[in-house]
């Protein structure tokens, strides 16, 4: 079975951008989950954070992926801190496919993208990932001035399961990325790929 590694800047980015790639052979690395450094031993003192983690575990129980959360401050990611962490997880998982977020107006997404580019470079001591894909975020559609997403790879998605899983993350649901919008985007990607509903990706590297 193919091993997939998804690097998600925040909890829920993976559901929005590459739900079709998530299964029991998938490992998700969450770069951060809060705007402050977290002592996970004392998480119960933060009801909002506890809710977020409980929601994540509900989704994990449904989709059966493995995950790790890095203790970085959301909105304050530092590329020099992320590169060694990404190299570590790539070497640990040795994935067949790596998924990274599209760079966008969101500063965290840009930093994660740039750090991932460095971490996946050909290197004597690091594992070389042969297939690297960039996934999109529906909230980026309003403005393409930074990076115009042009999908060149498509995968069939069970859109009802995607929406159902996303709604388990109640604290993260927003009006500008609601179920109808997710379905509409999946329909557009489906039209582009002759599928009913699909997710689109940019191929950054594909080595056979």
Name every feature range the model reports, one short phrase each.
Residues 1-93, 122-125:
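Active-site rim/loop-helix segments in enzyme catalytic domains that contact anionic ligands
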């Amino acid at each position: 079975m193919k091993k997939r590694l998804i690097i998600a800047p925040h909890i829920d980015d993976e559901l929005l951008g590459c739900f079709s790639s998530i299964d029991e052979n998938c490992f998700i690395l969450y770069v951060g989950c809060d705007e402050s450094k977290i002592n996970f031993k004392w998480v119960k003192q933060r009801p909002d954070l506890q809710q977020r983690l409980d929601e994540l575990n509900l989704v994990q129980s449904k989709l059966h992926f493995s995950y790790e959360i890095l203790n970085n401050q959301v909105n304050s990611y530092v590329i020099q801190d992320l590169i060694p962490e990404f190299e570590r997880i790539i070497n640990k998982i040795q994935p067949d496919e790596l998924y990274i977020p599209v760079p966008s107006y969101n500063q965290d997404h840009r930093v994660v993208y740039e750090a991932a580019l460095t971490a996946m470079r050909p290197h004597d001591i690091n594992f070389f990932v042969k297939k690297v894909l960039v996934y999109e975020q529906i909230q980026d559609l309003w403005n393409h001035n930074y990076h115009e997403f042009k999908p060149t790879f498509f995968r069939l998605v069970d859109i009802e399961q995607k929406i159902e899983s996303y709604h388990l993350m109640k604290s993260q649901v927003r009006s500008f990325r609601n179920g109808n919008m997710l379905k509409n985007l999946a329909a557009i990607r489906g039209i582009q790929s002759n599928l009913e509903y699909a997710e689109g990706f940019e191929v950054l590297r594909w080595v056979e």
